C-alpha cells in the first residue's frame, strides 16, 4: 500500500492550486510491503524530497550528517540491531556508516565504481538484448529487468499516491472536497488500486496513434 503528503502552492487564501501537469514542490511518501518468502517480516519504505528531512535518529549523534554531506541525498536503513546511513545519487563513492543500538559505530570502506564500457550502462543493455536471455551479458547487468521492473513499479506507486492527492470534487456548499487523501491499496497481480477507482486513471494511458507497443 502507499500513502503520501505533498506540499501545496497557494495563490488564493485557503485554496490550494492544482497543477496536474507538474510535480508538487515537496512530498513525503510511505510504502508498506508485506512479508514474503524472501523477507519474512513486513517492511516500510519512506521517501522524502523537496527539502523535507526525515527525523534524526536518536542513536546518530546530532552533529553527524544523515545520508550524504549536509544530510543531502541519502538513505537510512533501519534494522533490529542498528541503522546504516549512506550517501547516494551522486558521483561520489558510497560511504556507509553503521550505528548500532549498543552504542558502537562502524565506518564502511568507500565503494569503488564498477567499470563501465563506452556509452555506459545503455551499451550494456543493448549488448544484453543482442546476446539474449540468461546470456553472460544479461546476467552481468547491474539493473536487470528481474528486479528493475518491480522496483519501477514501487516508484510509480508513489507517483500514483502523489497524483491522487490533489483530486477534488465540489460539494453542495461550493467548497472542494479532497476525497483521495487516503492509503491506496495496490493489487500488483492485476495492476490496479482496489480502494479508490479514480486513482486507476493514472495507472495507464491512451497512447497516441502510432505509439502503441
Segments the model singles out, each with a brief description of its role:
Residues 1-144, 149-202, 206-213:
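Glycine-rich, aromatic-lined ligand/substrate-binding cores of catalytic
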